[in-house]
C-alpha cells in the first residue's frame, strides 16, 4: 500500500527552484487585482456616471374607469386605457401597495400584457398573493403590491402601472407609468 502514496511537500512562494509549483497568487498579482477592483468600483462615484433613473409617465386623457363603492377586495375589474385595444385590470388588493389610491392605498391598476413577450394575463390575478400571472408563455408573475415588479419568470421589466386619481367616489385613469408591450413609445400614437 505504501508504494501508491505520493508524498506532498510544501513549496514556499519564493522558491524558484520548482517552476510551475508556485503559490496560487503572488503579492504582486494580489495588489494588481485589488487596485484594479478599487479603481473600477470608484468610477461609479464620479458625477454623471451613476444616475437615478426616474420612471417615465405618459399622460393621457382622463377617463373614468370605476367607483370606490363598487370595488370589492380581491375582485378585479377589467377596463381599456389609453386605447380601446389595451387591456388593464383595476383591483382593490386589501393591503397597501406602491402607487395605490384610496383610504388604505390599496387600489391599483395595471396593464394585462406580460412585458417579456406580450402574453395575455387576463384572468390570472391571484387575490391570496396579490400577484398577476403566471403568464401562459413563460410563467412570469408580477407583484401588484410593489408597482408590478417581476416576482418570478423571464420578464425583466415591471408591468406598466396605470396612474389613478380619485374624485369623490369616482376612479379616473390619467396616465401610464412604464411601457406597454408592443408600443415603442406610448406617446407616439394619439388616443382614439
Curated annotation (Swiss-Prot):
Family matches, as InterPro entries: AioB/IdrB_ssu, Rieske_2Fe-2S, Rieske_2Fe-2S_sf, TAT_signal
Post-translational modification: Predicted to be exported by the Tat system. The position of the signal peptide cleavage has not been experimentally proven.
Family: Belongs to the AOX family.
Gene symbol of the encoding locus: idrB
Induction annotation: Specifically expressed under iodate-respiring conditions.
Cofactor: [2Fe-2S] cluster
Keywords: 2Fe-2S, Iron, Iron-sulfur, Metal-binding, Oxidoreductase, Periplasm, Signal
SUPFAM superfamilies in the record: ISP domain
Role according to the record: Involved in iodate respiration. Probably catalyzes the reduction of iodate (IO(3)(-)) to hypoiodous acid (HIO) and H(2)O(2), using a reduced cytochrome c as the electron donor.
Name of the protein: Iodate reductase subunit IdrB
GO cellular component: periplasmic space
E.C. no: 1.-.-.-
Assembly notes: The iodate reductase (Idr) complex is composed of a molybdopterin-dependent iodate reductase (IdrA and IdrB subunits) and two associated peroxidases (IdrP1 and IdrP2).
Co-factor binding details: Binds 1 [2Fe-2S] cluster per subunit.
List of residues binding [2Fe-2S] cluster: 114, 116, 135, 138
Localisation per UniProt entry: Periplasm
Source organism (scientific name): Pseudomonas sp. (strain SCT)
Coiled coil spans: none
Chain ranges of the Rieske domain: 102-173
A GO molecular function held by the record: metal ion binding
Stretch forming the signal peptide: 1-52
Amino acid at each position: 500500500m505504501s508504494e501508491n502514496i505520493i508524498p506532498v511537500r510544501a513549496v514556499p512562494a519564493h522558491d524558484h527552484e520548482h517552476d510551475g509549483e508556485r503559490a496560487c497568487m503572488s503579492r504582486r498579482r494580489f495588489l494588481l487585482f485589488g487596485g484594479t477592483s478599487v479603481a473600477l468600483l470608484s468610477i461609479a462615484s464620479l458625477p454623471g456616471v451613476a444616475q437615478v433613473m426616474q420612471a417615465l409617465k405618459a399622460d393621457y386623457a382622463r377617463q373614468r374607469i370605476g367607483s370606490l363603492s363598487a370595488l370589492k377586495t380581491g375582485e378585479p375589474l377589467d377596463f381599456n386605457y389609453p386605447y380601446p385595444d389595451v387591456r388593464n385590470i383595476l383591483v382593490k388588493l386589501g393591503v397597501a401597495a406602491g402607487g395605490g389610491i384610496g383610504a388604505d392605498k390599496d387600489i391599483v391598476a395595471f396593464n394585462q400584457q406580460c412585458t417579456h413577450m406580450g402574453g395575455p394575463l387576463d384572468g390570472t390575478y391571484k387575490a391570496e398573493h396579490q400577484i398577476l400571472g403566471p403568464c401562459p408563455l413563460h410563467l412570469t408573475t408580477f407583484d401588484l403590491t410593489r408597482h408590478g415588479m417581476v416576482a418570478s419568470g423571464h420578464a425583466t421589466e415591471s408591468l406598466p402601472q396605470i396612474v389613478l386619481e380619485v374624485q369623490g367616489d369616482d376612479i379616473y385613469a390619467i396616465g401610464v407609468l412604464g411601457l406597454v408591450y408592443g408600443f415603442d413609445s406610448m406617446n407616439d400614437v394619439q388616443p382614439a
